[in-house]
Amino acid sequence: MKVQSKAISKPKEHESAIYRNANFPDHLVETYSDDVHTLFDVFRHSVKQFGNKKAMGYRNLVKEHVETKMVTKVVDGEKKEVPKSWSYFELSDYNYLSFNDIYDKALRYAGALRKLGLNKGDKFELYAPTSAFWLLTAEACLSQSMTIVTAYDTLGEEGLLHSLRESGVRGMYTEGHLLKTLVNPLKEIESLEVIIYRNDAKEEDIKTIQEIRPNLKLIKFADFEKMSPPVEPDPPSPEEICCIMYTSGSTGLPKGVILSHKNMVAIVTAIVKHVPEVTSKDYLLAYLPLAHILEFAFENICLAWGGTIGYANVRTLVDTNCRNCKGDINTFRPTIMVGVPAVWEMVRKGIMSKLNAASAVKRSVFWTAYYTKAKLMRHNLPGSCVLDTAVFNKIRSMGTGGRLRYTLSGGSALSPDTKRFLSIVLCPMLIGYGLTEISAAAMVQNPACFNLDDSAGSLLPCTEMKLVDCEEGNYNSHGHPPRGEIWLRGPSLTRGYLNRDKENKESFTPDGWFRTGDVGELTPEGLLRIIDRKKNLVKTQNGEYIALEKLESRYRTSSLVSNICVYADQTKVKPLAIIVPNEPVVRKLATEQAGLSPDASWEEVCHNKKVRQLVYDDLIRIGRSHHFANIELIQNVVLVPIEFTPENGLVTAAQKLQRRKILDRFKKEIDAAYAE
């Protein structure tokens, strides 16, 4: 493999050389066309170039089917049969809008915003789940030089109030079911004058808001769409603020990251130039939160490619949650999917579950084909397509629509085993590394140089990087290989956090470098391997450091684990794991190997000592297979009978662990596990 990063300076004391993409050593890219300098220019340029081609597709809900069954639950220490309801969704086929259609809609929405009194320079918050209408409303704002403010629809009252108060928004787009979350914030926020809500809302929520704020304009989206004909754009300059993107807030109140139009055009340009293999013939499945920089950036990148975006919902991604129709993946049949590690682990475990239920002959055929293809890919030899046709295409057709060409994983660490497995069975999985502060990505694997290693890829041509010595863990930027804290600089880098002087001084240097807080290792090929975050490097009782995210990414590959939080007490020698078990697999194990009744409650299964031992044994097996040091092997496990969700506050909307909240919630169980 050719070297993919090039040093453009000499190393200094305590820091490495500065590195850039080997194909762009002399400059950092800022735009891909002379007429593209803002994110609205990206939109307008694509409309001119692709016209009547399909740009976006979405589905309508036809009917919600509710099924109720009796389940066993422990209530006040006694087992009781209680009713539990499941919802299944019947959806239409995809409805498509052309590039010309979406441009017309965006400028109609822009005219409506103007009629409602919103003007150039105003801030407009998008507080809603991902949809075509979210992005088109954003484009409407950008066409009139308004700044968009993003907030996760799972943010909750405190975080929402913080984003509204700090940014001073005048308008908002939301969903009817979220109006109730706005009731208390509206008592304090006087700047918010217009709320546009899509889909049905409860009359009591509407009435309450009108009583609190009688002069506030509360508009149904259906009415909003009809308010105005298209208006002329009043576009911004490159240095103007495109968006204030609130992070998901895993360590306190979310920070508002200020991203200019120049920042966003730089990241779009970098991906377009770095991944020329993706074209206007590709189809991107959109289901991650648009309030997350990864999704926001890649939907705009897809528009620049001239690809088609198909909007999906996490609840209807797969066929199992649908009735009288296929799920979003099998209906849209994407060629490109972007996801976070939690999604890819779920996909891998789904494939493994079906494989383990197959006959011995089919399993043998699968694994023979798997290891053969792995060898061919490792040595860049021909023949993989024969194995795809004979074995793997059937799996792709069943789960992903059969057209996937590339997947991308970002957001946090993914197990190398999962990347390797899905790259062989489905399609090449490109690993990326980035942050909101760098407008989504600093590194992405280059498809032309794809391999099965565990690096986060090569530098994008809009970013330069250096490694700086890190005392935590004794990482040396002059070592072999070089290791240290990752510092980034370039045109995609934010100017800073909104109203956060202290954090800005801590995170950004006077000469333009951003201290990421992440620790990386540079390979001889010029690829970056992420080791961990500085704050997740924990010194144990014997003085040695362990990397929590590294352990979690490996242990999460267990078929018994749905989610995991590794905790290391500095007064102890080893860490322990707080685990959300994979219920179907663990229930089967509890019945067959722990002697529990099939009717045992889920709480009983999770608290059973034999079940815990079986889960512990599997984690130790995985740790040893990865040659973990003794201090990296789990001391004990805590099995919890609830999921980690944004709704209960145990993960952020971006699926990042809320470590402190998890530790506080399960403190009693953690103390007991350490005491055993």
UniProtKB/Swiss-Prot annotation:
Coiled-coil parts of chain: none
EC category: ligase
Record EC number: 6.2.1.3
GO cellular component, one term: plasma membrane
Ranges spanned by the short sequence motif FACS, renumbered to the chain: 511-560
Any one Gene Ontology BP term: long-chain fatty-acyl-CoA metabolic process
Record-listed ATP binding positions: Y246, T247, S248, G249, S250, T251, G252, L253, P254, K255, G256, V257
Gene3D superfamilies, A to Z: N-terminal domain of ligase-like (3.40.50.12780)
One GO MF term attached to the UniProt entry: ATP hydrolysis activity
Keyword tags: ATP-binding, Fatty acid metabolism, Ligase, Lipid metabolism, Magnesium, Nucleotide-binding
Record field: catalytic activity: a long-chain fatty acid + ATP + CoA = a long-chain fatty acyl-CoA + AMP + diphosphate
Cofactor (UniProt): Mg(2+)
Domain of life: Eukaryota
Family: Belongs to the ATP-dependent AMP-binding enzyme family.
Its biological purpose: Esterification, concomitant with transport, of exogenous long-chain fatty acids into metabolically active CoA thioesters for subsequent degradation or incorporation into phospholipids. It may supplement intracellular myristoyl-CoA pools from exogenous myristate. Preferentially acts on C12:0-C16:0 fatty acids with myristic and pentadecanic acid (C15:0) having the highest activities. Appears to play a role in the maintenance of cell viability during stationary phase.
Protein's name according to its UniProt entry: Long-chain-fatty-acid--CoA ligase 1
Organism: Schizosaccharomyces pombe (strain 972 / ATCC 24843) (Fission yeast)
Taxonomy of the source species: Eukaryota, Fungi, Dikarya, Ascomycota, Taphrinomycotina
